[in-house]
Amino acid sequence: MAKGSKRVVRKRAEKKNIANGIAHIQATFNNTIVTITDIAGNVISWSTCGTMNFKGSRKSTPFAAQIAAEDAAKKAMEHGLRSVEVRVKGPGSGRESALRALSSAGLNISVIKDVTPIPHNGCRPPKRRRV
């Protein structure tokens, strides 16, 4: 008996129809990660400087953060996103440029929050670099 060939049927990514969301910008010294979620925290789209083909020290530039934020915003706007609440975390150089890129991509920014974690004298920080 011949076996019938089984064809794998993949589900297409559904287009969610979401008007409001949250844009999380994590700006570290080496990279910038932009994640756009709905109000509940489910990820709609994301982008990083590394996925936009910036490698090494070029990932930490404001221009790379701008390109990554524009990419994440375009992906999210395909799902119907119009306005976002922005939460910025970290001390990196891509904070402001990623924020500007989100607004210039066509998203309406309602609130900007800085959610950088600040220790109340917790862990010992890394030692100073001697270059």
Curated annotation (Swiss-Prot):
Q: Name one GO biological process term.
A: translation
Q: Name one GO cellular component term.
A: ribosome
GO MF annotation list? rRNA binding; structural constituent of ribosome
Recorded hits in Pfam families, A to Z, give: Ribosomal_S11 (PF00411)
Keywords attached to this entry: Ribonucleoprotein, Ribosomal protein, RNA-binding, rRNA-binding
Assembly, in brief, is: Part of the 30S ribosomal subunit. Interacts with proteins S7 and S18. Binds to IF-3.
Q: What does this protein do?
A: Located on the platform of the 30S subunit, it bridges several disparate RNA helices of the 16S rRNA. Forms part of the Shine-Dalgarno cleft in the 70S ribosome.
Write down the PANTHER family for this protein, in alphabetical order: 40S RIBOSOMAL PROTEIN S14/30S RIBOSOMAL PROTEIN S11
Per the record, the similarity remark reads:
Belongs to the universal ribosomal protein uS11 family.
Matching entries from NCBIfam families are given as: PRK05309.1, uS11_bact
What protein name does the entry list?
Small ribosomal subunit protein uS11
Q: Which gene encodes it?
A: rpsK
